[in-house]
């Protein structure tokens, strides 16, 4: 993206399910490289620690914090447990706009779709971000369906479901080309219908 500077600060190890947990005391960090070869800072702590290290130790002054793209969708009752969303919530508490993006698991993980969603959102909201008027009341959470057939449908904004039904596997959408009989009313229904779900998540859950 032209005119955009990306600073990578992330946990050194997988910290799935750690919510907005933070480490007491000093958090160690060191130079690191992502799996795709991008230089950044590896934080020996939780995702929310990475936000604190970026702001307080490295002196980063971001217009936006982007957390993800995570492997595994974070919808319904999974959202409060998510380290990806937890880092974004930590940014909100510091007055910084934040996005969280999550995709599927294994072969169904469409990271490209997640990254594209983030890039399109940044482009659409660039003026607000640079002007300091972007909202900081909620995290904008993106979830990409794990399509085994077809490709994700349009972006749809929906609220968070209370819980994932016991018989539903949100990590896999069998056929994203099928059109649901009714419009989705929450993030779980959106994923299972093959839609790219956008959901507002408050800082406190």
Show which residues each predicted segment covers:
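A cross-family phosphate/adenosyl-ligand binding-site feature
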Residues: 2-50, 60-61
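Extracytoplasmic/secreted cell-surface and envelope-processing proteins
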Residues: 16-18, 74-78, 108-111, 151
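Glycine-rich phosphate/pyrophosphate-binding loops
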Residues: 92-114
């Amino acid at each position: 993206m032209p005119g955009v500077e990306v600073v990578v600060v992330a946990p050194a190890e997988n910290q799935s399910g750690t919510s907005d947990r933070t480490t007491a005391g000093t958090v160690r960090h060191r130079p690191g490289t992502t799996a795709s070869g991008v230089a950044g800072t590896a934080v020996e702590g939780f995702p929310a620690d990475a936000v604190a290290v970026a702001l307080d130790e490295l002196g980063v002054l971001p217009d936006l914090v982007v957390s993800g793209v995570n492997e595994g969708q974070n919808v319904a009752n999974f959202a409060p447990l998510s380290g990806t969303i937890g880092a974004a919530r930590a940014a909100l508490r510091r007055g910084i706009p934040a996005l969280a993006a999550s995709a599927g698991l294994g072969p169904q993980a469409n990271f490209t779709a997640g990254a594209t969603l983030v890039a399109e959102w940044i482009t659409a909201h660039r003026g607000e971000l640079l002007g300091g008027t972007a909202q900081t009341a909620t995290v904008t959470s993106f979830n990409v369906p794990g399509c085994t057939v077809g490709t994700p449908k349009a972006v749809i904004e929906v609220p968070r479901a209370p819980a994932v039904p016991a018989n539903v596997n949100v990590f896999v959408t069998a056929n994203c080309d099928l059109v649901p009989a009714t419009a989705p009313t929450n993030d779980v229904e959106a994923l299972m219908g093959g839609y790219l779900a956008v959901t507002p998540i408050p800082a406190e859950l």
